[in-house]
Amino acid sequence: MTVVIAAINGKGGAGKTTTLMNIAGEYALRGGRVAMIDMDARNNLMKWWTDSQEKDSQPEGIEVYSHKTARGFEHWMQENASAFDQVLIDTPGEDTSIVDPVIASSDLVISPIQPSKREVLGAIDSFENVLRINDALGRECRHGVLRTRITVTVRHTELYRKIRPIIEDTVGTYLFRTEVFERNVYKDIHNGIGTLQMLEVTEAIAKARRETRALVEEVDTLLGGASMAEHAA
């Protein structure tokens, strides 16, 4: 059965594309067939894909498509989604006419955030949209907030320390235990060198790989049916 994961944050969201690229690379490494859909007008995902093709670095097991309208997305899902093990969707975030159909098709929505008030509020908006769509359609799409571009300095800020109580206690959604740190390799990948999993393993790459594996393990746990509260315990 095809698993559908979307990255959504109505206020931008740090690292949506990078997060999905890393998750896709991990699933492809396992032997999965992964589709990625670029619905963001900035075309970051599609640019990475074409640049990787030009450098003969396109990863095996991954295909990337571009759809900018809800109709195009829904048609593609009906005709093609079942041919893939995972479908990962990079969204524009703010256009509800696009985001609502994406949520309606998703098993999990990930809202990446940097520790900023704007992005935390965007993640909360995304969670509320998931609840709204679930209620309207009788679905059980899950939602999680992922902290990205983390540094040692960021970890000492007041807002960083407030993220967990805000997200888990006040809002009531899931906060990933895995954090995505600010790493040069994540920037390098966007230059068309394929996925993280294709790179020669150095100490820096090994850290990023461990980080990504931990994230995907959490994703699999959520998709496997464990409640968010249970997994957070």
Per-region residue spans from a language model:
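Charged phosphate-binding loop/patch that engages nucleotide di/tri-phosphates or the phosphate backbone
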Residues: 209-233
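Inter-motif core of Ras-like GTPase G domains
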Residues: 98-117
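Beta-strand-loop-alpha "switch" segments that mediate conformational coupling across diverse proteins
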Residues: 151, 163-196
